[in-house]
């Protein structure tokens, strides 16, 4: 998770999110990319669900969103469900919704391997001095240890 950009938010109901959206003077919700972003970030179904996977360079849905899914990567069927969800807010512009999804995903990018490795705790066992010996049968001496540090 991109800790620099991502903030924890409490997911809100449709009515709560509608109150947050920018409206015209007549009270009608404006159909803007920014309103789409607000919905994607705060709607209780979509909040924290859409992220850019830096390893695959694809947009992923990373939490249950209330419809059947077969994998993590955002697909056409997911888009149809998201469009249907956005209609609850009076927004149906597929281009604006797609733009908002790209922005939200980019702001919540992650790298699954880096995140996994950064989450590991070192067990305190020194391995560098022994790696060349273990994998290549090299002598365990100061030279091979220093060579591994390079």
State what each model feature region is.
Residues 2-123:
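Intein modules and their embedded homing endonuclease domains
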Residues 104-150:
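P-loop NTPase catalytic core of nucleic-acid-dependent motor ATPases
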């Amino acid at each position: 998770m991109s800790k620099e950009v991502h903030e924890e938010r409490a997911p809100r109901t449709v009515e709560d999110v509608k109150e947050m959206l920018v409206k015209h003077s007549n009270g009608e919700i404006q159909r803007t990319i920014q309103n789409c972003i607000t919905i994607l970030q705060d709607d209780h179904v979509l909040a924290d669900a859409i992220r850019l996977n830096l390893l695959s360079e694809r947009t992923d849905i990373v939490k249950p969103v209330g419809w059947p899914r077969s994998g993590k990567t955002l697909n056409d069927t997911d888009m149809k469900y998201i469009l249907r969800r956005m209609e609850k807010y009076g927004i149906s512009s597929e281009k604006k919704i797609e733009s908002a999804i790209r922005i939200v995903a980019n702001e919540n990018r992650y790298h699954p391997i880096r995140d996994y490795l950064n989450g590991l705790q070192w067990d305190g066992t020194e391995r560098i001095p022994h790696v060349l010996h273990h994998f290549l049968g090299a002598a365990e001496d100061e030279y091979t240890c220093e060579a591994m540090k390079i």
